[in-house]
Curated annotation (Swiss-Prot):
Protein name (Swiss-Prot/TrEMBL): Fructose-1,6-bisphosphatase class 1
Intracellular or extracellular location(s): Cytoplasm
Enzyme Commission no: 3.1.3.11
Originating gene: fbp
Cofactor: Mg(2+)
Subunit structure and binding partners: Homotetramer.
HAMAP family: FBPase_class1
Length: 334
C-alpha cells in the first residue's frame, strides 16, 4: 500500500531539477484536507453549519463552513513557507503572505476551499479544489495579482478532494491523474487509482435542468439529444446532478459522462469561476483523456482578466464534450 507522501516523493525523483518545494506544498494541502475531513464529519455537532451572514465579492452569502475551510487551508499553506500568496473564492482580493520565506517562494495557490458547501446540511458530498502556478513576478518581492491571472495551461499542479462516503484526494502535476483514498484509522491517503482515465464515451449528463428555460438553444438541443432513443449510441443517457462540481466531476471521471454549467439568461457569462473551479478541473480532465471548454474554446487557453471571472463550463468524456460543442456551434446566437 503506497501513501500519497511516498508516491509524490517517488515521482519527484523522475525530475532531476526538482527541489522538493512542490512536494512540500502538496503536503500542506494534504494536511488541510485532513483537517476539513475531520470537522465535516462532526459538522452537525458543532456550530459550523448554516450561513455566516456575510456575503463574498460575488454577492453570495457565505456558509460558515466555507469560511472555516478557507482559514484552515490558508493557515496550512502559510505555515509551510512554499507559497508566496493565495487567491480564494472566499477572499475579495489576493492574500499576500509576508516574510522572507514567502517572498522567496516560487508558487501561488488558487482554491475553492469548500465546493458545494450548501449540501453539508443534508449530508451530501462536497469538495475542495486547488490550482498551483509558478509566480511570474521576480523572486524576493511580494506577489501581485499578475501572478494569479495566468491561463490554465500554465498550471504546474491541480486537484480536488471529495468528502463523501470516503474522502479521496485526486491530483495531477501534468503526468497523469492519480487518486488516493483516506484511511482515517491510519491518518494517511493511500493510492487507490493510478493513471485514471475518463472513459471515451459515457452515458451520464450532469446539468441543473431546473434552469432549462434559461439555457442557450445549443444546450437545449444537446439535452434533447441525450434524451432521445438510439441503441447505436446507447441513448437515452441518464441524468445525474448532485449540485457539487467536485462530486459530479468525480463520478463522471470514473464512470464516463459530461458536466455542463452553461451561460443562462440570468448569468450570461456562466456561474463557475475560471480560476478556482474551471481551470483546475480542465487540467485534470485533459490529463485524464477528457476535454473541457466554454462551449467553443479550450478552457486552458483563456487568459483571465479578473480574479473572480466566470465562464460557461463543459467538461467530461471527450466525445460527449465535442458533441455538445457541435450543438453550440450549430445554434450560436439562440
Amino acid at each position: 500500500m503506497k501513501t500519497l507522501g511516498e508516491f509524490i516523493v517517488e515521482k519527484q525523483q523522475d525530475f532531476s531539477h526538482a527541489t522538493g518545494e512542490l512536494t512540500a506544498l502538496l503536503s500542506a494541502i494534504k494536511l488541510g484536507a485532513k483537517i476539513i475531513h475531520r470537522d465535516i464529519n462532526k459538522a452537525g455537532l458543532v456550530d459550523i453549519l448554516g450561513t455566516s451572514g456575510v456575503s463574498n465579492v460575488q454577492g453570495e452569502v457565505q456558509m460558515k463552513l466555507d469560511l472555516y475551510a478557507n482559514e484552515k487551508l490558508k493557515a496550512a499553506l502559510k505555515a509551510r513557507g512554499e507559497v508566496a500568496g493565495i487567491a480564494s473564492e472566499e477572499e475579495d482580493d489576493i492574500v499576500i503572505f509576508e516574510g522572507d520565506r514567502a517572498e522567496n517562494a516560487k508558487y501561488v495557490v488558487l482554491m475553492d476551499p469548500l465546493d458545494g458547501s450548501s449540501n453539508i446540511d443534508v449530508n451530501v458530498s462536497v469538495g475542495t479544489i486547488f490550482s498551483i502556478y509558478r509566480r511570474i513576478t521576480p523572486i524576493g518581492q511580494p506577489v501581485t495579482e499578475k501572478d494569479f491571472l495566468q491561463p490554465g495551461h500554465r498550471q504546474v499542479a491541480a486537484g480536488y478532494v471529495v468528502y463523501g462516503s470516503s474522502t479521496m484526494l485526486v491530483y495531477t502535476t501534468g503526468c497523469g491523474v492519480h487518486a488516493f483514498t483516506y484511511d482515517p484509522s491510519l491518518g494517511v491517503f493511500c493510492l487507490s487509482h493510478e493513471k485514471v482515465q475518463f472513459p471515451p464515451n459515457g452515458n451520464m449528463y450532469s446539468i441543473n435542468e431546473g434552469n432549462y428555460i434559461k439555457f442557450p438553444m445549443g444546450v437545449k438541443k444537446y439535452i434533447k439529444y441525450c434524451q432521445e432513443q438510439d441503441e447505436a449510441t446507447q441513448r437515452p443517457y441518464t441524468t445525474r446532478y448532485i449540485g457539487s462540481l467536485v462530486a459530479d466531476f468525480h463520478r463522471n471521471l470514473l464512470k464516463g459522462g459530461i458536466y455542463i454549467y452553461p451561460s443562462t439568461a440570468s448569468h450570461p457569462s456562466g456561474k463557475l469561476r475560471l480560476l478556482y473551479e474551471c481551470n483546475p478541473m480542465a487540467f485534470l480532465a485533459e490529463q485524464a483523456g477528457g476535454k473541457a471548454s466554454d462551449g467553443a474554446n479550450r478552457i486552458l487557453d483563456i487568459t483571465p482578466s479578473k480574479l473572480h471571472q466566470r465562464v460557461p463550463f463543459f467538461v467530461g468524456s471527450k466525445s460527449m464534450v465535442e458533441k455538445a460543442e457541435s450543438f453550440m456551434a450549430e445554434f450560436p446566437d439562440e
